[in-house]
Amino acid sequence: MADLSSLKDLGTASEAAAPAHVRKVDSLGRSYATGKRKNAVARVWVKPGSGKIIVNGKEFADYFARPVLQMILRQPIVAAARDGQFDIVATVAGGGLSGQAGAVRHGLSKALTYFEPGLRSVLKKGGFLTRDSRVVERKKYGKAKARRSFQFSKR
């Protein structure tokens, strides 16, 4: 390692050490990422195309029937202003529909940044690249649920 003699040298050394975000694409021209939310895990592939979104072999509007879930899934594409430019294929397992939609959104955001590193700042600012670590709190013994106590009778 180079000898750092002043603070100016330290600044240039840290700039050189910062990893540049490079494009990660497989032999078929796709970017791959995994997304997680609650107990759901999604594997997402992104490639240039007409804007088709397939989730577990179905059209995303058929798989996620509720409009709120469809909106959650499309948020990264809309935020990046890339609507209709990518074909997205996702397989998702575990959890319920809300967790699965969040997992696909997380994986899609990561895959978009791998395909187009310039989108990273926009998606990071929107909070799409951050893993939502909130999970259900476990039930404790001596309690009805995680925190709710059994009904108490004074007399």
Swiss-Prot record:
This is Small ribosomal subunit protein uS9. InterPro entries: Ribosomal_Su5_D2-typ_SF, Ribosomal_uS9, Ribosomal_uS9_bac/plastid, Ribosomal_uS9_CS, Ribsml_uS5_D2-typ_fold_subgr. Belongs to the universal ribosomal protein uS9 family. One of its GO terms (molecular function) is structural constituent of ribosome. Coiled coil: none annotated. Keywords: Ribonucleoprotein, Ribosomal protein. GO terms for cellular component: cytosolic small ribosomal subunit. GO terms for biological process: translation. Gene3D superfamilies: 3.30.230.10.
